[in-house]
């Protein structure tokens, strides 16, 4: 199976909502790793609406010191009910970021072992280049996706990172982009030409539906019908179709990258 990492050059283009959306549409067991070191867990605060007291990434530092990192990981992940998704939640405060730097390299080895054993791993790496950034995960995933919007500011911020990620790519490691809101105003072809990277897929621009994944918001209501109608409309939405298509494209690209290593 595959280790797939999503990261942003700047701002908040929608990495977390996209990772969660892809995971919740994944056709087989998948582990989500919240590796964004910049603040408290966005997943616990957002998707799980302020859930507190759950173990997570920071608890693995002590396990690593004791030489039991691989054994400790299953004990600190949380399972999402009625899904095949489990989540390793991130840091609790920004002050923990420097301490995370020591865990990324050994955690990479554990995650690769998990992927080799048949479980996919999706990493939310947050913004590139910040203190405590999970550089080893970004550099050595089967597939790294640079997530950005399609406006000029996003392209300008992503340009140097696209060049750096391409230059650092090793055999078996693929780097592509994932565009949130293609055509606002630039096309996938424009993005690819500017950054010198292929565009894996585009995720629809739909902040209201993205909030369902990022913030645990209720699904948009329909004019007729109650929650069941809202569920059906959400499942049939162009946004969710784009999330599913992005996940399928990511699985194929990661598989191809692994075959080429």
Task: For each feature predicted by the language model, list its residue ranges.
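Structural motif
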Residues: 7-11, 34-37, 90-92, 124-127, ...
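Hydrophobic beta-strand segments of well-ordered beta-sheets in folded domains
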Residues: 3-4, 28-31, 85, 121, ...
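P-loop/Walker-type NTP enzyme "switch/lid" segment
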Residues: 32-113
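Walker A/P-loop phosphate-binding motif and the immediately C-terminal alpha-helix
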Residues: 2-44, 114
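C-terminal lobe/tail of nucleotide-utilizing enzymes
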Residues: 167-261
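Conserved catalytic-core segment of NTP-binding enzymes
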Residues: 109-111, 115-204, 211
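Short coil/turn connectors at secondary-structure junctions
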Residues: 1, 27-28, 83, 117, ...
């Amino acid at each position: 199976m595959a280790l797939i990492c999503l990261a942003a050059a700047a701002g908040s283009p929608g990495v977390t909502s996209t990772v969660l959306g892809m995971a919740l549409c994944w056709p087989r067991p998948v582990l989500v790793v919240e590796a964004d070191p910049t603040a408290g867990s966005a997943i616990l605060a957002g998707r799980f609406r302020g859930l507190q007291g759950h173990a997570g990434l920071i608890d693995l530092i002590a396990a690593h010191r004791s030489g039991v990192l691989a054994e400790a990981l299953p004990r600190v992940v949380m399972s999402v009910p009625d899904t095949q998704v489990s989540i390793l939640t991130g840091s609790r405060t920004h002050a923990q970021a420097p301490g995370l730097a020591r865990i990324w390299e050994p955690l990479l080895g554990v995650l690769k072992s998990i992927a080799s054993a048949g479980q996919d791993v999706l990493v939310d790496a947050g913004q590139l280049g910040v203190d405590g950034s999970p550089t080893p995960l970004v550099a050595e995933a089967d597939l790294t996706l640079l997530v950005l919007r399609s406006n000029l500011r996003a392209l300008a911020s992503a340009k140097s990172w696209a060049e750096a990620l391409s230059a650092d790519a090793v055999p078996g490691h693929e780097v592509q982009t994932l565009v949130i809101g293609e055509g606002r105003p630039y096309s996938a072809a424009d993005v690819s030409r500017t950054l010198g990277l292929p565009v894996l897929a585009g995720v629809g621009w739909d902040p209201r539906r993205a909030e369902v994944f990022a913030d645990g918001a209720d699904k948009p209501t329909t004019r007729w019908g109650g929650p069941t109608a809202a569920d059906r409309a959400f499942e049939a939405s162009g946004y969710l179709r784009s999330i599913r298509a992005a996940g399928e494209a990511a699985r194929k690209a990661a598989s191809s990258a692994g075959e080429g290593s």
